[in-house]
């Protein structure tokens, strides 16, 4: 074989010319101990709190505890594949997720990876999951209604855009159903309404069964509501760090709409399970436990999440993010640690009660204990006009009903009040998946507070309401359109509505 020196030198020169001088420097550490979704890592001296680190096999983790001789890392994934002595790399990045309209109609995990089998998500933007909430200056007080389609809520405990309204109750009292109905109620606006009124929905499922989440997504899909919704799921089988992260990830996705002058609604279902996951992580990281073994900063965990729901002022695009956090109580005990924390953070709460639920009053809202601290500024004028009196009448009814159990001989006025209260309570019942438009609610409640139901038997109230709505939708569309456009009951509209109800009441009798 003939070796030519000139050729070899030419090849060597070519190779040397193309030699890159960049040496890759990455800070690495070693796993000392791993288990229960937590790894103790030695090394990584300059790692920052909350920074993402990478384990072999592409599994990510987040540095939470920075101690003198090691770093406590929570693992976003299965810890089965990580072993002692594995090399851990710093990434220099804080946890972020994809955001934007590309996520609408998709189901993702807490890191924004699709889990619905519909292929990758081509999002153009990513956002950090844990950012500071808007300050005082960019905010504006809540003044636009966020209609849920449920008479009991829109009339008595109105929720505004940018508000945080807690949904609290025992298991199986219909908490998720309220969020689901609110999502479905946005469908008509997305189909026909102006862009500025559209409300994009984000649902965060924390620690739920996979079958429950699948059922929720199926209902959204069947009713055409998935196209404007994002579902973030960290189910019961996911590691605790994913359940802790999911609400923050969902919030970042909702904030994208808020900061672009649009409106979003986010339901956290539920924050009790997030607190339990956070407690598990904290105890495994050897942080000192406090009341009910929760760590000392569990209040801050929820307050920094819920403060990100806000209504921004016009200079900042006038967008909003409304939050409906869910808390599950045990035995109606709202004075436990997590329920009292979240009640004090939110702008009101919707109490759901088991005994009301089993009496057939659904949604099982306890109207006496539920409040909205935004109140009637989150209602259109027409709703204020009819709902003002229903609140008072129901309050009197509850008071009288308690006394009426003792006395048999009641005067006519008390009897009238009890009759009216029973019929109004019946009127506020509503089957699931049948949200009503605001103008339809106004018409129905107007009939209730003006005595049209008083002569009916209680079991006829539902039929009367159905018939009245059918009549208004077909023969008196102008009345409903008038209320929708005017947003108030003018004398002219009132006369038309009264005539329509009178005509129907005659035929119903």
Swiss-Prot record:
Membrane topology reported for the UniProt record: Peripheral membrane protein
Catalytically driven reaction(s): ATP + H2O + 4 H(+)(in) = ADP + phosphate + 5 H(+)(out)
Major subcellular site: membrane
Presence of keyword Repeat: no
Positions of the record's site feature: Required for activity: 370
Enzyme type, top EC level: translocase
GO cellular component: a single term: plasma membrane
Binding site for ATP: 169-176
Entry GO MF terms: ADP binding; ATP binding; proton-transporting ATP synthase activity, rotational mechanism
Compartment annotation: Cell inner membrane
Keyword Nucleotide-binding listed: yes
Enzyme Commission identifier(s): 7.1.2.2
Family assignment from sequence similarity: Belongs to the ATPase alpha/beta chains family.
Subunit structure: F-type ATPases have 2 components, CF(1) - the catalytic core - and CF(0) - the membrane proton channel. CF(1) has five subunits: alpha(3), beta(3), gamma(1), delta(1), epsilon(1). CF(0) has three main subunits: a(1), b(2) and c(9-12). The alpha and beta chains form an alternating ring which encloses part of the gamma chain. CF(1) is attached to CF(0) by a central stalk formed by the gamma and epsilon chains, while a peripheral stalk is formed by the delta and b chains.
Function of the molecule: Produces ATP from ADP in the presence of a proton gradient across the membrane. The alpha chain is a regulatory subunit.
Descriptive protein name: ATP synthase subunit alpha
Lineage: Bacteria, Pseudomonadati, Pseudomonadota, Alphaproteobacteria, Hyphomicrobiales
Gene assigned in the entry: atpA
């Amino acid at each position: 074989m003939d070796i030519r020196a000139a050729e070899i030198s030419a090849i060597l020169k070519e190779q040397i010319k193309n030699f890159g001088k960049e040496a890759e420097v990455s800070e690495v550490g070693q796993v000392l101990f791993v288990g229960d979704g937590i790894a103790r890592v030695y090394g990584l001296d300059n790692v920052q709190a909350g920074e993402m680190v990478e384990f072999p096999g592409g599994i990510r983790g987040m540095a939470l505890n920075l101690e003198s001789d090691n770093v406590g890392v929570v693992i976003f994934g299965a810890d089965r594949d990580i072993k002692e002595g594995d090399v851990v790399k710093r990434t220099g990045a804080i946890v972020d997720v994809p955001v934007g309209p590309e996520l609408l109609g998709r189901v993702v995990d807490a890191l924004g990876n699709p889990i619905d089998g519909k292929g990758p998500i081509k999002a153009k933007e990513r956002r950090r999951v844990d950012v500071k909430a808007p300050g005082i200056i960019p905010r504006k007080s809540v003044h636009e209604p966020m209609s849920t389609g449920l008479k009991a809520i829109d009339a008595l405990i109105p929720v505004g855009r940018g508000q945080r309204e807690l949904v609290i109750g025992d298991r199986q009292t219909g908490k998720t159903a309220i969020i689901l109905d609110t999502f479905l109620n946005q469908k008509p606006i997305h189909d026909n309404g102006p862009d500025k009124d559209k409300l994009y929905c984000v649902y965060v499922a924390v620690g739920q069964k996979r079958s429950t989440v699948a059922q929720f997504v199926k209902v959204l899909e069947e009713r055409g509501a998935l196209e404007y919704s994002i579902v973030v799921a960290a189910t019961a089988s996911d590691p605790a760090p994913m359940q802790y992260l999911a609400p923050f990830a969902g919030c970042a996705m909702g904030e994208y709409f808020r900061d672009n002058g649009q409106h979003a609604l986010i339901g956290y279902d539920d924050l009790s399970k997030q607190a339990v996951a956070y407690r598990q992580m904290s105890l495994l990281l050897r942080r000192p436990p406090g009341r009910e073994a929760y760590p000392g900063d569990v209040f801050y965990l929820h307050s920094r999440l819920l403060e990100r729901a806000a209504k921004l002022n016009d200079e900042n695009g006038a967008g909003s993010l409304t939050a409906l956090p869910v808390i599950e109580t045990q035995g109606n005990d709202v004075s436990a640690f997590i329920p009292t924390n979240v009640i004090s953070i939110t702008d009101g709460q919707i109490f759901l009660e088991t005994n009301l639920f089993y009496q057939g009053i659904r949604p099982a809202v306890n109207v006496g204990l539920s409040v909205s601290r935004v109140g009637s500024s989150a209602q259109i004028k027409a709703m204020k006009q009819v709902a003002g009196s229903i609140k008072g009448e129901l309050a009197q009814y509850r008071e009288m009903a308690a006394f009426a159990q003792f006395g048999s001989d009641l005067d006519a006025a008390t009897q009238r009040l009890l009759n009216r209260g029973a019929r109004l309570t019946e009127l506020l019942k509503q089957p699931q998946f049948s949200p009503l438009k605001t103008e339809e609610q106004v018409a129905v409640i107007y009939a209730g507070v003006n005595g049209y139901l008083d002569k009916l038997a209680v079991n006829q109230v539902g039929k009367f309401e159905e018939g009245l709505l059918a009549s208004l939708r077909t023969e008196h569309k102008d009345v409903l359109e008038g209320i929708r456009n005017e947003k108030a009951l003018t004398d002219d509209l009132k006369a038309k509505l009264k005539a329509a109800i009178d005509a129907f009441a005659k035929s119903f009798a």
